[in-house]
């Protein structure tokens, strides 16, 4: 039953949150039935004061409580169930990780099938799934792969731990072997900027290993590859109908963040060429200028701050992208939990970091990506990644 429970959970990581919750609940019920035990919910001791402070902050700024209470119930359910699951599996984390890597491969195979069908028929068969976003085209016959997830960016982040394991640690457990190239190909076709940044980092990593003693040679080769990548990937990264290229999106986002010190939203988002950088800048603006910047406005209140600062003040009623999740965990934590919450989250990442455990490092990569692009607290394995990160902080694992 433990193997079945693990497969249920790693499958849920790549599906929408309500399906993930159902699969997680099923896995926990299987384990409770098999072992006839329930662990004390110790994480609840941390959640209770957080929720009390959060609701108090919401009350002080005069916001409505409907969405905050909904978010509290959802996050609490995920945390309590994942705590039970990881307690049952605390001695079998490597087995669970192996299943996650293999499931990443299966999800990538679905992505390959999605791309092949689109190339042959022009139909994106995945767009009929619930919660799926619009199809993004790279050319008339090539689209951004999403597989079972809503966007290519979501898929790129969800398989990031697999990329780190396969191409930084080089698959020491021999989980995929040569099949790892399928994962890399699909990752590249998601056109997620994080995937391309990872490729540059991986290249630096391996180049340093081979030419570590020859710093000048290493520097010249790195510079040449970066320049080549910018020149060659830019036309490929440009979306056929909807987006500018990968490097344009990265550069435009940097420019938007650099203007964040301005107190006027119109100045912050002016000259933005890409929708993603405009959305990033807008939500970061909300995070910096919402009420109660020390403790935030409370969980689930970012849409209310967004409505007050963007819709009402600047009459920008057409800017509704990512209004619920804030585009990035950084924005949402800053908006809803203030600077104190943001500092506590960074402290959490530092406290549980374990460079001697490859699984810990792999999931840190995913959490860093979510910090910059992915503000939903429970979507696509967010809670799963945080629990894996915590439970692998106590021991070393390198093969």
Where are the language model's segments positioned?
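Helix-loop-helix junctions and helix-breaking kinks within/between transmembrane helices
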Residues: 13-27, 63-71, 150-157, 178-215, ...
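Hydrophobic transmembrane alpha-helices and their immediate junctions
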Residues: 173-176, 203-216, 314-316, 322, ...
């Amino acid at each position: 039953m433990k193997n079945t429970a693990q497969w249920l959970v790693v499958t849920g990581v790549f599906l929408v949150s309500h399906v993930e919750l159902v699969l997680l609940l099923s896995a926990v019920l299987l384990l409770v039935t098999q072992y006839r035990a329930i662990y004390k919910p110790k994480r609840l001791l941390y959640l209770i004061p957080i929720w009390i402070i959060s609701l108090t902050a919401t009350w002080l700024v005069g916001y409505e409580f409907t969405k905050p209470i909904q978010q509290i119930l959802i996050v609490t359910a995920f945390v309590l169930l994942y705590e039970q699951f990881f307690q049952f599996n605390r001695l079998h984390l490597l087995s669970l990780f192996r299943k996650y890597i293999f499931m990443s491969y299966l999800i990538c195979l679905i992505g390959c099938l999605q791309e092949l069908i689109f190339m042959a028929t022009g139909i994106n068969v995945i767009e009929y799934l619930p919660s799926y976003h619009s199809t993004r085209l790279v050319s008339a016959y090539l689209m951004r792969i999403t597989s079972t997830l809503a966007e290519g960016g979501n898929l790129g982040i969800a398989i990031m731990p697999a990329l780190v394991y396969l191409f930084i640690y080089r698959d020491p457990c021999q989980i995929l072997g040569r099949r790892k190239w399928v994962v890399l190909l699909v990752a590249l076709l998601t056109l997620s900027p994080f995937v391309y940044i990872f490729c540059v980092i991986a290249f630096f990593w391996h180049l340093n290993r081979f030419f570590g003693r020859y710093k000048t040679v290493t520097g010249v080769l790195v510079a040449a590859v970066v320049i080549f990548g910018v020149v060659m990937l830019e036309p490929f990264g440009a979306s056929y109908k909807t987006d500018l290229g990968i490097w344009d999106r990265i550069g435009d986002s940097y420019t938007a963040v650099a203007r964040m010190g301005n107190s006027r939203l119109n100045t912050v988002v002016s000259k933005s060429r890409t929708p993603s950088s405009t959305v990033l800048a807008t939500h970061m603006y909300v995070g910096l200028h919402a009420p109660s910047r020390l403790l935030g406005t409370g969980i689930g209140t970012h849409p209310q701050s967004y409505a007050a600062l963007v819709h009402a003040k600047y009459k920008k009623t057409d800017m509704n992208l990512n209004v619920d999740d804030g585009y990035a965990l950084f924005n949402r934590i800053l908006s809803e939990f203030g600077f104190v919450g943001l500092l506590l989250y960074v402290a959490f990442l530092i406290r549980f970091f374990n460079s001697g455990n490859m699984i810990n490092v792999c999931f840190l990569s995913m959490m860093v990506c979510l910090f910059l692009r992915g503000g939903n607290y429970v979507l696509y394995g967010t809670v799963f990644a945080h629990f894996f990160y915590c439970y692998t902080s106590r021991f070393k694992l390198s093969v």
